[in-house]
Amino acid sequence: MGVTQVGVNTSFNLVKKIILLVVFSLTLVLLFFYKNHNNKSHIQIGGDFELTNHLGQKTTNDSFNGYHRLVFFGFTNCPDFCPNTLNNIGIVINQIDKKDQLVPIFITVDPERDTVAKLKKYLTNFHPKIIGLTGTNEQIKSVKTKYKIFSKKVMDTKKENGKSNNHNDGRDHGCYGVDHTTIIYLMDKKGVYITHFSPDTNNTDMVKKINQYL
């Protein structure tokens, strides 16, 4: 009888240990997935910057506090994609419900050519709410890093009679274009990343998505 009781106790203890081990393992798995999900929901895009707007005023991330932002990187010598995107952003601004709560921001990836004066002149072609930002090479490099933006100069080797054949105006600092990331970011009122739009997102979908957050 005593032997049987010992056997029962041993089996019970074994089952208890197995249950505790399973519970512990499940806890670790749940913690892993929670941490993973938490990291994904707080994507580190954006942050502090110090640049100059197209009116010559010092501008930081805090300058836009209280407003959602649409942030797009490009350059004024861009032949078609940048102007098309800026035109589309203007259309979106006109169609959203609370347009006074959203600021569209255009940050250059070509600070050598995109001076304050050039940005100001360029932006007269687009929606008046769009704010252009430029800065030194180091300032632009810093803000590109924070927004996960890639850009690279592409030299124009096709020339006729000493003039560039590409669509970029290379008169200022040589003949080159700039390959760059073409994502449009939607940031919240504190400059925290919400979502982004790819180049092929149509205006209707953008308006619908933006209205969800304003």
Language-model-derived ranges and their functions:
Residues 46-47, 69, 181-183:
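Short loop/turn microsegments at loop-to-beta-strand junctions
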Residues 86-145:
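Structural microenvironment flanking redox-active thiols in thiol-disulfide oxidoreductases
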Residues 120-181:
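Short, internal strand/loop/helix patches
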Residues 1-52, 213:
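N-terminal targeting signals for export/organelle localization
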Residues 61-85, 89:
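Short active-site neighborhood of thiol/selenol oxidoreductases, capturing the structured segment around
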Residues 50-69, 93:
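A short beta-strand-turn-helix
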Residues 158-214:
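Thiol-/selenol-based redox modules, centered on thioredoxin-like
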